[in-house]
Amino acid sequence: MSLNSLTYPLRYEDLSLDTDPEIRLDIDRIDEPANSEPGFEGIIGRSSALRSVLQMVETVAWGDSTVLLLGETGTGKELIARAIHSHSPRRDRPFVKLNCAAIPTGLLESEFFGHERGAFTGAIAQKIGRVEVAEQGSLFLDEIGDIPLELQPKLLRVLQEREFERLGSTRTKKIDVRVVAATHRDLEGMILKGEFRSDLYYRLNVFPISIPPLRERPEDIPLLVEHFVQEAARKLNKTIDAIPSDSMAALTDYQWPGNIRELENVIERAVILSRGSVLRVPRRDLQSRVTAGHSGAKLETLADVEREHIRAVLKQTRWVLSGPGGAAARLGMNRSTLYFRMKKLGIVRPCF
């Protein structure tokens, strides 16, 4: 049975290997022509929502305009940034990534602009910053909403004047680099709170592209499942060639607050746990996810859905956040992102 001839839902109890209840997965295909748009290998999906994004990528790629990618965590913003670079005249030049949320504030300026020997305590050698490494290429600034206020004027200078100085140097260096930034945060709301400069926002927001969450492109989920099964099976040296139809239906119906990253994590765990050639998504895990998306009481906002889902996973893991079996891994996030989401959603660890 192919992915184009799905019949579901079926009762899980009725499934057996000799009744053809599974969707056959074409895991031997290498180039995945049916899963990706031509020229966008690695970006999986054929939905109209994704095609709209890729059309915008093709439109903006050939210029040098700054691009701002907007979307929830785990939606694939880095893949879109790389697609912009690979479709641009700078494709043969460096693509340099800097995650503004992953580097301590005290080190971020040095990562951006570099430093001279002796610029500060511990600077025992000259360091070339990411801006300089990206010369004639593209600089991808992930989580731009987390850049400290004191560093924002210097980034604005790079965008406006195309120049900077290394820390500890008075020599101004000219730079030729295209900036693509990304964030899951509400930058306009941050401006109103005094947390983000409006002039920097306007420089970044020349060509915004909104990346749709996975729940808005459910028709892409079977293709993503096939892709992630293929990747995980190869990595783990296993053979998985089918998935129960009701499992695929449940995966497709679920809202995926962690988006593609969460789906990838769920599939890898399922491949690890599957003993035969049929993908077995843990029934308890799958049922908790489906319940979160199909509860009797309709939740008012997406934040409510996300809050309840994170709480459910935290209870399953006994509030253990780290490690391969922790809540962060189950949700497809890193621990710092989970801490941030818990704080934002008002989730407090109970006293045991």
Spell out what each predicted region is.
Residues 56, 87, 115, 154, ...:
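Conserved helical "switch/dimer-interface" subregion of ABC/ABC-like ATPase nucleotide-binding domains
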Residues 153, 157, 165, 334-340:
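Base-recognition residues in the alpha-helical recognition helix of bacterial helix-turn-helix
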